[in-house]
């Protein structure tokens, strides 16, 4: 197997990177009909597997779970989750041959083995589904020509997929059909029905490609979604304690600060997030964000380049072959960091304090979101895809840190995201520690900014620059489809 993206010529690469179309709600008028009466078999029962299955069953589909024989015999977590929710469970040999749609929702590193095992068992003309295209694009898995290959990728952790569905809503979703595997032209109908069954059509669906989903997903999770949050958490906690802050208070300010700040981002983009600051603090955050973007632009570009070339995937798959030697080392190092070991703080921090004393946190969010978006768009990824893989998902990842700090974030995200997160943070932490953190001024972090006069012309120009950034333009339109979004922040 070889990297599928690298087998394409430049025109094909650009066409697939740039495939992105926001689908009208009328295109989902048939709902789940294309899958009604069909047998859907999900392989894997983790967060995405279980919660997508629950939604699909509640939408009237026939759903079962195929697990490895040893997982059933040993009654592992996946088996218990499926059976406790009343699903039919069987091994591959029992369930795969009767499936009309086999959905592979196992971790990325298991995809090659899983797909190699289920393919020979699939009946002629069946469909194979993914929620992340890594196996097709980066591994280059070859699928039988009679099999239709589709993707439905909710832009949310599995738990949120379920919770939004139960509210009568859904989460924004990308769908795609692999151009090499659509023998009967039925792929789009299957993908649309699957997206409807999970509730995605209620929140907005982008017709994308496997290539665009993978490359943008990898870039977002490595940089702003996980890498920047890890980098900022480690550096900001270190700075606060060095300046004499109570370690417990500092830990809470960082742990819940990301979530509180990005809740404003979720509701009104960078504009609303910056509007939560006082005028002097807004000007200072704008300046800090500009400095951060200048410093980090080469690092963001390197991650994008390595993702496009396949160098990132090649390195990660080598680590898979070495039993995750690097991943496990970096995970252990993160667990021993000062931020992770900070004592609990029993007092309350009111919501506005997270903004007033977290100007640097706001600046880091602004810089990271804009840089990730700009880098993806400059590489041929359409603005809508770049928005979903940067700004949209950030509050959801920040929420995991609020629950159990970086440990929870790295447990919830995929191993692929975790590996990329460490690569980014391992480079960004020393870069910013030496070239940026030492230049901070009083009021940037931990203390309110001293009162000072504001130049009206400067404030006007900053406000215009914030509002006119391309991510704000596309974000305002896409958020219009998500007016029922619930508030997720739990800070206190």
Swiss-Prot record:
Source organism of this protein record: Edwardsiella ictaluri (strain 93-146)
Cofactor(s) in the UniProt record: Mg(2+)
Record domain KARI C-terminal knotted: where: 209-344, 345-485
Catalytic activity entry: (2R)-2,3-dihydroxy-3-methylbutanoate + NADP(+) = (2S)-2-acetolactate + NADPH + H(+); (2R,3R)-2,3-dihydroxy-3-methylpentanoate + NADP(+) = (S)-2-ethyl-2-hydroxy-3-oxobutanoate + NADPH + H(+)
EC class name: oxidoreductase
Family of this protein: Belongs to the ketol-acid reductoisomerase family.
Pathway(s) it belongs to: Amino-acid biosynthesis; L-isoleucine biosynthesis; L-isoleucine from 2-oxobutanoate: step 2/4; Amino-acid biosynthesis; L-valine biosynthesis; L-valine from pyruvate: step 2/4
Amino-acid positions noted as binding substrate in the UniProt annotation, renumbered to this chain: 414
Domain KARI N-terminal Rossmann: start-end pairs: 15-208
Catalytic center residues: 132
Cellular-component GO terms for this entry: cytosol
Entry keyword set: Amino-acid biosynthesis, Branched-chain amino acid biosynthesis, Magnesium, Metal-binding, NADP, Oxidoreductase, Repeat
Binding-site positions, NADP(+): 45-48, 68, 76, 78, 108-110, 158
GO molecular function: ketol-acid reductoisomerase activity; magnesium ion binding
PROSITE patterns named among the record's database cross-references: KARI_C, KARI_N
Annotated cofactor note: Binds 2 magnesium ions per subunit.
Function: Involved in the biosynthesis of branched-chain amino acids (BCAA). Catalyzes an alkyl-migration followed by a ketol-acid reduction of (S)-2-acetolactate (S2AL) to yield (R)-2,3-dihydroxy-isovalerate. In the isomerase reaction, S2AL is rearranged via a Mg-dependent methyl migration to produce 3-hydroxy-3-methyl-2-ketobutyrate (HMKB). In the reductase reaction, this 2-ketoacid undergoes a metal-dependent reduction by NADPH to yield (R)-2,3-dihydroxy-isovalerate.
Gene assigned in the entry: ilvC
Entry EC number(s): 1.1.1.86
A Pfam match: KARI_N
Chain sites annotated for binding Mg(2+) 1: 217, 221
GO biological process, alphabetically ordered: isoleucine biosynthetic process; L-valine biosynthetic process
Protein name: Ketol-acid reductoisomerase (NADP(+))
């Amino acid at each position: 197997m070889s990297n599928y993206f690298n087998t394409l010529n430049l025109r094909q690469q650009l066409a697939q990177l740039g495939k992105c179309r926001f689908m009208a709600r009328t295109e989902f008028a048939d709902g789940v009909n294309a899958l009604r009466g069909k047998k859907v078999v999900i392989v894997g029962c983790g967060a995405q597997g279980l919660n997508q299955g629950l939604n699909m069953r509640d939408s009237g589909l026939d759903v079962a779970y195929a697990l490895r024989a040893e997982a059933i015999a040993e009654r592992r977590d996946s088996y218990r989750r499926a059976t406790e929710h009343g699903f039919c469970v069987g091994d591959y040999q029992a369930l795969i041959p009767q499936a009309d749609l086999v959905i592979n929702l196992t971790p990325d590193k298991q995809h090659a083995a899983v797909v190699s095992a289920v393919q020979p068992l699939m009946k002629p003309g069946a469909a194979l589904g993914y929620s992340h295209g890594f196996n097709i694009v980066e591994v280059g898995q070859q699928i039988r020509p009679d099999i239709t290959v589709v993707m439905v990728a909710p832009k949310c952790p599995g738990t949120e997929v379920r919770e939004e569905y139960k509210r009568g809503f859904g989460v924004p979703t990308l769908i795609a059909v692999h151009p090499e595997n659509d023998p009967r032209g039925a792929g789009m109908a299957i993908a649309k029905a699957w997206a409807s069954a999970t509730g995605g059509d209620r929140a907005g669906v982008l017709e994308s490609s496997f290539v665009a989903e993978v490359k943008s997903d990898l870039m977002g999770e490595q940089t702003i979604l996980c890498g920047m949050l890890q980098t900022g958490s480690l550096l900001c906690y270190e700075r606060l304690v060095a300046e004499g802050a109570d370690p417990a208070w500092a830990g809470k300010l960082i742990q819940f600060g990301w979530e509180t700040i990005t809740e404003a981002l979720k509701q009104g983009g960078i504009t609303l997030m910056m509007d939560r600051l006082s005028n002097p603090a807004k000007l200072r955050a704008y300046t800090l964000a500009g400095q951060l973007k200048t410093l980090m632009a080469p690092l963001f570009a390197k991650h994008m380049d390595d993702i496009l070339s396949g160098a990132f995937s090649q390195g990660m798959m080598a680590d898979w072959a070495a039993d995750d030697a690097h991943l496990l080392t970096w995970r252990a190092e993160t667990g021993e960091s000062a931020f992770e070991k900070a004592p609990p703080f029993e007092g309350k921090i009111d919501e506005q304090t997270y903004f007033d004393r977290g100007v640097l946190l706001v600046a880091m969010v602004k810089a990271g979101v804009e840089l990730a978006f700009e880098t993806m768009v400059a590489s041929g990824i359409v603005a809508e895809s770049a928005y979903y893989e940067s700004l949209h998902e950030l509050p959801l990842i920040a929420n995991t840190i609020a629950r159990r700090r970086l440990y929870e974030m790295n447990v919830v995200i995929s191993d692929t995201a975790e590996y990329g997160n460490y690569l980014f943070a391992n480079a960004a932490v020393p870069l910013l520690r030496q070239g940026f953190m030492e230049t901070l001024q009083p009021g940037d972090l931990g203390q309110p900014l001293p009162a000072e006069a504001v130049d009206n012309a400067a404030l006007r120009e900053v406000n215009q620059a914030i509002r006119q950034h391309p991510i704000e333009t596309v974000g305002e339109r896409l958020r219009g489809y998500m007016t029922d979004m619930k508030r997720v922040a739990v800070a206190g």
